[in-house]
A protein has these predicted regions:
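Residue-level recognition of well-ordered beta-strand positions that form the cores
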Residues: 41, 53-55, 98
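A short glycine-rich, hydrophobically flanked beta-strand micro-motif that places a catalytic Asp/Glu
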Residues: 35-44
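Rossmann-like S-adenosyl-L-methionine
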Residues: 57-206
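Short, aliphatic-rich beta-strand segments
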Residues: 5, 48-57, 107-110
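Short strand-connecting beta-turns/loops that link adjacent beta-strands
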Residues: 45-48, 102
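Extended interfacial segments that mediate partner engagement and assembly in macromolecular machines
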Residues: 1-35
Length: 206
């Protein structure tokens, strides 16, 4: 259980690699930002939009808000502070992403707390593989646990209508927003578990 200290992480995106040491250096200079800081989470995109969540074991007050806002401008990131039953959003709690899939651009917004694919290149390859192996159809598509519409939105171009389910409120909100960003109107997102969907399909529940 020995702790191994590292000063860089080569498997994350170049932008996160660049921001990490700058962020840690600036945090270490301010006791209010450093005090009981438990963890840091990064949510980035290929557009270099970067959301950083600072997680604390203490309540965050106005002094923290002021310093976090200064930190945002110094590093050009978006910051959220989290502690028990507390979420402090300094500017925004989401990032913008643009994916080029089969030579077509799709716009997405990823919200903090929602599920996202961590490897953008692999994600694009997965979506393209599915699209390239499905013929255009006049039939409908049902997708379970759709997240923020990562597969749903590109796949909607292949089908008449799409019904997509998800249990996360955050993901459903993002999915509906992502439909608007891409001017897609043939998808209906509903909040429902797979078990509930099967019950509805079998007419066990309304």
């Amino acid at each position: 259980k020995n702790i191994l200290e590292i000063d860089s992480c080569q498997i994350v995106s170049p932008h996160i690699q660049e921001v990490m040491p700058k962020l840690l250096e600036l945090i270490s200079k301010e006791k209010e930002l450093e005090d009981k800081l438990f963890g840091i989470e990064f949510l980035g995109s290929t557009t270099n939009d970067l959301l950083v969540t600072l997680i604390y074991h203490r309540k965050l007050g106005e002094a923290w808000n002021i310093l976090a806002k200064e930190l945002e401008s110094k590093v050009t990131i978006k910051i959220i502070g989290r502690s028990r039953k507390q979420k402090q959003i300094i500017s925004e709690d989401l990032i913008s992403e643009k994916l080029n899939i089969n030579n077509k651009d799709y716009n997405f917004e990823y919200q903090e707390g929602g599920f996202t694919q961590p490897n953008t290149n692999v994600n694009i390859q997965m979506i393209e593989w599915v699209l390239n192996n499905i013929q255009d159809s006049s039939k409908d598509l049902c997708e379970l646990y759709c997240g923020g519409g990562n597969f749903t939105i590109p796949l909607s171009t292949k089908f008449n209508k799409v019904l997509a389910t998800e249990i996360s409120k955050t993901s459903i909100k993002s999915a509906r927003r992502n439909c608007e960003l891409n001017n897609i109107s043939n998808i209906e997102f509903i909040r429902m578990s797979a078990e509930e969907f099967v019950q509805a399909l079998n007419k066990v529940r309304a």
